[in-house]
Amino acid sequence: MSGHSKWATTKNHKFAQDAKRSKMFQKFSKEIIVAATLGGADPDSNPALKLAIAKAKAKSMPKANIEKAIAKVAGGSKDGANYVSYLYSGTAMGGVTFLISCLSDNFNRLSSNIKHYFTKHNGQLGKQGAIPYVFDQKGIIEIAKSDAAEDELMMVALEAGASDFFSEDDSFIIYSEPTNFQVLKQTLDDNFKIENYLTAEVTYIANTEVDVDKAKLEQIEAFVSLLEDDDDIQEVYHNAYCEDN
């Protein structure tokens, strides 16, 4: 359980687009509304909602926004019932693989837009719904070093089923299998007074990376920004890596 976590660099690429905070919060709200609609507005009995809330909190979404999204469903709104999750993958930018997570109430619109984005950038779409072999789905929890002592945190995390543990410059990063994420996070909640997790979500991590230069990375980030501007697209992942970035 040593070395450098890929998440430490991946998150910098992935969240380079997060300056558009309003758009980001809108997408978190949609995810919360859909989860609450499908499984109920009580996060204690709805794991999907609990996960969506944890993810939003970790990205500093205001508590009032989260409560408003939940209250909308509790008040009888059925907006979330029309949304369906979709997963797209494809290659572009000279062999870089992209994985795109979507929540849409209009499959035809979404499908047409995705095809347009990849065609415009000389890309090729993979099979809809398939996860490329270059990505692994993992639970990720990142905690500021000021919030916990390393030895105690590592011991508690491993006993709760963590699959890996890394100490970075300013934070601890804990990996888990997706099926064990909720148990792990609840255990940390019970044992530590962590006000704000830096990251708390089930996400995709590249296990095989494509090395690119800064110029190519800028093109990739522009493509990611284009994708994330689409209201139907929730998350965009890629396996490009720039050593000089």
Swiss-Prot record:
One example GO MF annotation: DNA binding
Name of one Pfam family that matches: TACO1_YebC_N
Transcription regulation listed as a keyword: yes
SUPFAM superfamilies assigned to the protein according to its UniProt record, in alphabetical order: YebC-like
Cellular compartments per GO CC: cytosol
Keyword Repressor: no
UniProt GO BP: regulation of DNA-templated transcription
Localization per Swiss-Prot or TrEMBL: Cytoplasm
Keywords: Cytoplasm, DNA-binding, Transcription, Transcription regulation
Chief place where the protein resides: cytoplasm
InterPro entries: Integrase-like_N (IPR017856), TACO1_YebC-like_2nd/3rd_dom (IPR048300), TACO1_YebC_N (IPR049083), Transcrip_reg_TACO1-like (IPR002876), Transcrip_reg_TACO1-like_dom3 (IPR026564), YebC-like (IPR029072)
Domain of life: Bacteria
NCBIfam families membership: PRK00110.1, PRK12378.1, YebC/PmpR family DNA-binding transcriptional regulator
Annotated family: Belongs to the TACO1 family.
Protein name per its UniProtKB record: Probable transcriptional regulatory protein MARTH_orf271
Organism: Metamycoplasma arthritidis (strain 158L3-1) (Mycoplasma arthritidis)
Organism ancestry: Bacteria, Bacillati, Mycoplasmatota, Mycoplasmoidales, Metamycoplasmataceae
